[in-house]
Amino acid sequence: CCTVGDIRAKVMLKSKAGECDLVVIDYLHLLSSVRQKNETLDQVVGRNVTALKQLSLEADCPVLLVSQMNRACETRPDKAHVPVMSDLRDSGTIEQVADCVVFVYRPEKHGITKDERTGENLVGVGKLYIVKNRNGATGIARFRYNPSYTKITNYCNTVTS
């Protein structure tokens, strides 16, 4: 894999040439880092997140950073397993530094195929939980997905065949 320094060098070159519109890193925990003596994984991840935020500011280019979650949401007593901010794996720094935090959630993946409150069929329905948005609103956005094609489309409550 590569380091934040490797990414920084490439992004700054592209940025100076006016060719940097978005940086996507999939995913945070695969970034290589030299771990200092007595440094925790949380601290290493935090250092990388902070460096990527600084890069975003310097290059004037957004960074979309994909991160793994811990397993806490899977052990909650409610069967929905809806993610919350503290589910971000190995770093409270993500919560502090990120401008926006969005969780992708698919009820069907947890065996939930019908909304108990509304009766809506949830097969092929996903939700984006916008749990932090420094420059806008938070909330839930629905989408449709087709796992056969890994295709995401706009949400419409009426499904046509």
Regions found by a protein language model. Name each.
Residues Y27:
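Walker B catalytic acidic pair
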Residues L31-S32:
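Catalytic P-loop NTPase motifs of RecA-like helicase/translocase cores
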Residues C61, V66-Q68:
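Conserved H-loop
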Residues C2-V23, Q36-E39, R47-A59, R71-S161:
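C-terminal regions of RecA-like/P-loop NTPase motor modules
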Residues D42:
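Donor nucleotide-sugar recognition loop
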